[in-house]
Design a protein with these regions (language model features):
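Histidine-acidic metal/acid-base catalytic patches
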Residues: 1-16, 20-140
Length: 140
């Protein structure tokens, strides 16, 4: 990521995908610190560390990892989105946060997972000082 950002123009923004970066072995907080001025959009996708820990990268592909359930929504995985969102807030990020999860809907019902992700994102964004306007999704 650093090499790409250092060799691309300042006008090229970064879509920070926390789950993909963590899956690839990157440090999400370090990426925010190093490239905050160019972050234009954030995907808040979580990872399941136990899936990564047993993945044989010499034999299993990215798609295999997805099928095994490596990704999930915030609040259901291993990343600390409280720290991630706070770091973004500390650097003045004011763009979109989009919950994303690539997972099997038969194993993880989409509406329930959307509720889990929404609840966690609202919790960490409020704690980081963001004002969030909602249209009622996820209300109890």
């Amino acid at each position: 990521l650093d090499a790409f950002m250092n060799h691309s123009g300042e006008g090229i923004p970064l879509l920070l995908d926390a789950g993909h970066l963590a899956f690839a072995g990157g440090d999400v907080l370090r990426a925010i610190d190093n490239h905050h001025a160019r972050i234009g959009h954030v995907h808040v996708k979580d990872i399941r560390r136990p899936v990564i820990d047993v993945l044989d990268r010499s034999k299993q592909s990215f798609l295999d990892a997805v099928a095994l359930g490596v990704f999930t929504v915030p609040g259901d995985g291993s990343l600390d989105f409280g720290k991630i969102v706070q770091r973004l807030a500390d650097h003045g990020y004011e763009g979109w946060f989009v919950v994303e999860a690539e997972q099997d809907p038969k194993k993880n019902p989409p509406f329930r997972m959307a509720q889990v992700g929404y609840k966690e994102l609202m919790r960490v964004m409020t704690a980081a000082g963001y004002t969030v306007e909602t249209q009622g999704f996820g209300a109890d």
